[in-house]
Amino acid sequence: MRVTGDRISEMGRELSARSGEAVCDLTGKWLLPGFFDVHTHGRAGADFSDSPSGELVRILSSYAKCGVTSLLATTMTMEENYSREMMERIRGAMEAEGEGARIWGINMEGPFLGPDKKGCHDPAYLKKPDCAFFEELDACSGGNIRLVDLDPTLDGAMDFIRTYAGRKKISIAHTSADYETANLAVDAGADHVTHLFNAMNELRHREPGVVGMVNDRRVWAELICDGIHVHPSVVRMTFASNAEKLCIVSDSLSAAGMGDGVYSLGGLEVHVKGKRAALADGTLACSVSNVFEECRNVISFGISPEKAIAAACLNPARAMGLETEIGDIRKGLLADMLVVTPDMELKQVYIGGKAVQK
């Protein structure tokens, strides 16, 4: 394989090094596409909802060092004026000339969420889908909101989905919706489910709820695979049902990579101990994991490396309409790549063909 500039320019067994070219011999190792986290609130002490643009640029290097070369900056439910400022800060980070993971857009998780499944979102700022407010936020972001999370049972939700389907990705999220309502949302244009099994009704054989959409080939589903949010046996069951449409996500907060302590998420206090992050009342509050670690978990749960790796790079790229840029190793794509051992030990990360400093 040859990299020219920041893209893969040639592939083939017949290639040989030209004079002056640097050569990387990866004998005995695997070369993987860089991983893509479509749902992450932050890590390394900074949060996409709270931190200034400079801090957001800083943590992109932290993502890259753990194998995440692409991400969607994921927001929380905040006060309206603060939400506008939040979008502007993320826009600033996207426009900065920094090193590290690429921000491909914003995953707007809130405020259009159900109060009965609010999780760690502040109920004081939840609201019904509002096209005018959304347009304001999208303008503040520079048009960079790529994924919008919402509860399809809220007044105006179906109209919102029909209005923005095709322009934005719409995800069913934080909802008590039954299967029939979820199916209507997909018919209207939603094609994504936020952290499957979490912040939704549990699966029942007569009332499958949103979980029942997992084998609908129209729908991409996020899955937090830290071993805490979803039991390993359920991860195996879900991969057996529809591995080609699953996206491993971290749903990480600023505490990821930082250790035990008390942190803030969307203005709420989060307590971290070991691998568990929770509000004071015990409600799970995001994770302290990363997609590379979770991909390793999935393999240890008994899923084939091929399916686990695809769920960390190719599937999310397809889900976000970015498969012509990232998610695979083929001619013309960005040279965002990981060098790993066969037992998934991360040895080197490349972004745009340039080695990331460890």
Can you annotate each of these PLM segments?
Residues G212-A221, F239-S250, A255-V340:
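His/Asp/Glu-enriched, well-ordered alpha-helical/loop segment
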Residues S62-L72, G114-G142, L184-L196, E207-W220, ...:
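Active-site gating loops and adjacent loop-to-helix segments of metal-dependent hydrolytic enzymes
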Residues W30, V38, F48-R102, Y125-C140, ...:
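Alpha-helical scaffold segments that flank or form the walls of functional sites
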Residues D138-M258:
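Active-site core of metal-dependent hydrolases
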Residues H41, V57-M86, A101-G114, S141-T153, ...:
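Divalent metal-dependent hydrolysis catalytic cores, especially in the metallo-beta-lactamase
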Residues F35, G42-S51, L72-Y82, A199-N215:
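Active-site loop-to-helix "anion-binding N-cap" substructures in soluble metabolic enzymes
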Residues G28, H39, Y63, M108, ...:
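Conserved, mostly hydrophobic/aromatic
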Residues M1-L32:
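Histidine-rich, glycine-flanked metal-binding segment
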